[in-house]
Amino acid sequence: MERWPWPSGGAWLLVAARALLQLLRSDLRLGRPLLAALALLAALDWLCQRLLPPPAALVVLAGAGWIALSRLARPPRLPVATRAVLITGCDTGFGKETAKKLDAMGFTVLATVLDLNGPGALELRARCSPRLKLLQMDLTKPEDISRVLEITKAHTASTGLWGLVNNAGLNMVVADVELSPVVTFRECMEVNFFGALELTKGLLPLLRHSRGRIVTVGSPAGDMPYPCLAAYGTSKAAIALLMDTFSCELLPWGIKVSIIQPGCFKTEAVTNVNLWEKRKQLLLANLPRELLQAYGEDYIEHLHGQFLNSLRMALPDLSPVVDAIIDALLAAQPRSRYYTGRGLGLMYFIHHYLPGGLRRRFLQNFFISHLLPRALRPGQPGPVHDTTQDPNPSPTVSAL
């Protein structure tokens, strides 16, 4: 085909005018998505010059630019006005940062913490307005939940409760399922599932009245079978399914439900090396003799080191998660799922589309120990069978 002379400036002028208008209205998301869209438009321009006559090429390029800018538009948000939000787990991490951001935006924030005199609570008192109210709550204690429900009803009597952010979470152990005491599964379920369930059910009358929002911080570990995170992952899978069920059941009431799926971020609870060392020592101290001989103490030490090394990739900037929570609270049409964090798209692509063998190999290299258990190493004797019963005792640790 003979190449047509291509005055592409007309299409680009339309795209630039639309982009400028969106910028003036603060309605354009800047950053890598915008750069990627411009690169794709430039590639499309190059193809149009070679394959299409000018009128058709003008329509295609201008239409593609219009669609791209529409996708990059900031979704319309509801006004903050006098909205009140309850956030759990505000001692550290996502909860604390979200509480500070919502308070700065003008929300009435009810922030639950484990320790009213802890560093997180002290920081919130110092940096936030008098509108923010701190509430002590341990999600493993029904009496704490009941007290918070009563205080919330009284505190929001005039404004109503717009949103609940289920952020509090707990991970007790990083180890193979066989090495993980059953009590660690129960502890994760108490905080990550049953506590969130009881609190959410208790607040539903207020949320039905306001036609508000439920936002829950989940985890990719609830979607994918990460080795050595079974106790944490199963509890997150349970809460995700519960929230999906709520999403269907509460739709007629006008309540919108969202789940935030963050990648690896540098929160205090995740990167507390001393805490993970104590949990490793507790695991070793309570392992039955047979299991310790079959796996070897060096296997557990190596696994612990691999896990800590993986945390070096944790992202220090928590704002992507905080921004996702805020969007779920204020967007006119919030998403049911928000995926935040580096590499999550690739991980989900592998999990959903690659054959099972490749998926398992990928997950096995996530941070799992590459050292074989002692009984599987060449030249090692088989495991010793211990006929004594060991209940795997472990003291209960409250949510962090």
Swiss-Prot record:
GO cellular component terms given for this protein? endoplasmic reticulum; intracellular membrane-bounded organelle
Species lineage, top-down? Eukaryota, Metazoa, Chordata, Craniata, Vertebrata
Q: Where in the cell is it found?
A: Microsome; Endoplasmic reticulum
Residues binding NAD(+): 82-111
Q: Ranges of Polar residues compositional bias?
A: 389-400
Q: What does the entry report regarding how activity is regulated?
A: Inhibited by glycyrrhetinic acid. Induced by progesterone, through the Ihh signaling pathway.
What is known about the tissue distribution of this protein?
Highly expressed in kidney, adrenal gland and distal colon, and at much lower levels in lung, hypothalamus, hippocampus, and midbrain.
Q: Which organism is it from?
A: Rattus norvegicus (Rat)
This protein is called what? 11-beta-hydroxysteroid dehydrogenase type 2
User: Where is substrate bound in this sequence?
Assistant: 219
